[in-house]
UniProtKB/Swiss-Prot annotation:
Keyword tags: Methyltransferase, Transferase
Protein name, UniProt field: Uncharacterized methyltransferase MTH_231
Keyword Ubl conjugation in annotation: no
InterPro entries: MeTrfase_MtxX_xsu
GO biological process: methylation
Organism: Methanothermobacter thermautotrophicus (strain ATCC 29096 / DSM 1053 / JCM 10044 / NBRC 100330 / Delta H) (Methanobacterium thermoautotrophicum)
């Protein structure tokens, strides 16, 4: 199991061609260990730390190392106003079946529980219940949303919000499950890249630890958000497991 050594909280972050991570680390009010190559980062994964932020290092070899422990899915932590939530699936090839989305919902919920947060799941589908009959695609999406909700309800607090994602956010859901990865990716881009929502990076679900994935072209401000998010997760994770 990956973790911190000797009880010290170590946050490891990668620095590639984009040096903004160095600026972000200097602004953090906690210690950040910077590494400057994929090889160093992978060695840190094997060594153990409280949390990892990929930063501006290339993804391929690092993700391959993470996947040695089993399949991974990503969930993006987004803040809209005072409300924060994990949005998944966000990879365009993820969450294609109800079973896939159930596994993602469970992984995201268990991840939050390890940080001391109680999951509240919002399931999103392609229409309101009154839209049944408008098209086969809408019908399928709504029925899948209902079925997924029935699968989750014995494990976590959950509600099927149909297409009303704004209500899921307003109600304080901290796990939001999109109808598929393409839709999740579009929701992310609409909220963060077009709108004013803030992204703190994507956590790797299925990794036995805390790994926050970030863009290689992120600003120093964006990397600082990711570092603070990783630190917040690590503190909750450690307190919950003491």
């Amino acid at each position: 199991m990956y973790g911190s050594e000797g009880g010290a909280m170590r946050i490891v972050a990668g620095v590639g061609e984009n040096r903004n991570m160095e600026r972000a680390a200097s602004l953090a009010d906690f210690e950040v260990d910077l590494v400057h190559s994929e090889e160093e980062f992978i060695e840190e994964l094997r060594r153990g730390a409280a949390a990892y932020v990929r930063g501006s290092l290339p993804a391929a070899n690092i993700m391959a190392e993470l996947k040695k422990g089993g399949p991974l899915n990503r969930a993006s932590w987004i803040e809209v106003g005072a409300n924060g939530f994990l949005l998944a699936p966000v990879g365009i090839d993820e969450g294609r079946t109800v079973d896939d989305r159930f596994k993602i919902a469970v992984s995201a919920s268990e991840f939050l529980r390890k940080t001391g947060e109680e999951p509240r799941v919002g399931v999103i589908s392609g229409g309101r219940r009154g839209d049944l009959g408008r098209s086969p695609e809408v019908d399928r999406s709504i029925h899948e949303g209902e079925f997924l909700t029935s699968m989750i309800k014995d494990k976590y607090r959950v509600r099927h919000y149909h297409i009303l994602i704004e209500e899921a956010v307003a109600d304080g859901c901290n796990v939001i499950i999109a109808p598929d990865g393409i839709t999740g990716n579009l929701i992310f881009r609409s909220l963060v890249l077009v709108g004013t929502a803030r992204s703190y990076g994507a956590v790797a679900l299925g990794f036995d630890g805390i790994f926050v994935d970030t863009s290689r072209s992120q600003t120093a401000e964006g990397y600082l958000r990711a570092l603070k998010f990783a630190h917040w997760l690590a503190r909750g994770w450690n307190e919950d497991n003491e």
